[in-house]
Amino acid sequence: MQQKQMNIELRSKTGKGISRKLRSADMVPGVVYGKGMDPMAVSINYRELQAAMAGEGGQNNLITLVGGGSLDQSMAIVADLQRDAVKGTYKHVDLHRVNMSEKLRVTVPVVLKGTAIGVKEGGLLDFAHHELHVECLPGNIPDHIEIDVTSLAVAHSIHVGEIALPEGVKVLDNPKTPVVSVLGRVKEEAEAAAEAAEA
């Protein structure tokens, strides 16, 4: 988990017109919410928001908020980020103020390590789930969860319940769900034959 710092400004005015003006000034409109507080409208410099999400942790980076009155020195993560459908630029951000002693739920990417022995034997790697839902303290949010697939043979899978997790991290997905598998040639040929028959 990476820790970042980001300046924020409180804003009293909201609405589409105000949001457009902020974006034209290279600012991103947003809101900060959390347990025991009313949502607070804020604005953030576009480049600062980019920097706060830089690195492998992305939206799960733990951010120290600077400024914003009572929000100053609060810890937060990016809960939701809206982007322009065409340009991909940031339109609005939701920041979740967290309590460092209370667990929260986040989505963490899965990273595969090594080359499966089944692939070397001609099988096809099927990476079915690229993310896992986990619960942990904010300070324990992993940048990613690594799975070593080196010994994964043809017609075998690694399921959620078999993954080694970092200390203090609990996975919420069904433990029987296959995350990565190696499909064999026989299965591929059967699927191809079935598709040909349907056609």
Swiss-Prot record:
Domain of life: Bacteria
Annotated TM spans: none
Gene Ontology MF terms in the entry: 5S rRNA binding; structural constituent of ribosome
Annotated GO CC locations: cytosolic large ribosomal subunit
Coiled coil: none
Pfam assignment, any one: Ribosomal_L25p
InterPro entries membership: Rbsml_bL25/Gln-tRNA_synth_N, Ribosomal_bL25/Gln-tRNA_synth, Ribosomal_bL25_b-dom, Ribosomal_bL25_C, Ribosomal_bL25_long, Ribosomal_L25_dom, Ribosomal_uL5_bac-type
Range of residues in the leader sequence: none
CDD domains registered for this protein in UniProt: Ribosomal_L25_TL5_CTC (cd00495)
Keywords: Ribonucleoprotein, Ribosomal protein, RNA-binding, rRNA-binding
SUPFAM superfamilies, A to Z: Ribosomal protein L25-like
GO biological process: translation
Function: This is one of the proteins that binds to the 5S RNA in the ribosome where it forms part of the central protuberance.
Record's subunit section: Part of the 50S ribosomal subunit; part of the 5S rRNA/L5/L18/L25 subcomplex. Contacts the 5S rRNA. Binds to the 5S rRNA independently of L5 and L18.
NCBIfam families: bL25_bact_ctc
Family statement drawn from the similarity comment of this UniProt entry: Belongs to the bacterial ribosomal protein bL25 family. CTC subfamily.
Protein name: Large ribosomal subunit protein bL25
Originating species: Pelobacter propionicus (strain DSM 2379 / NBRC 103807 / OttBd1)
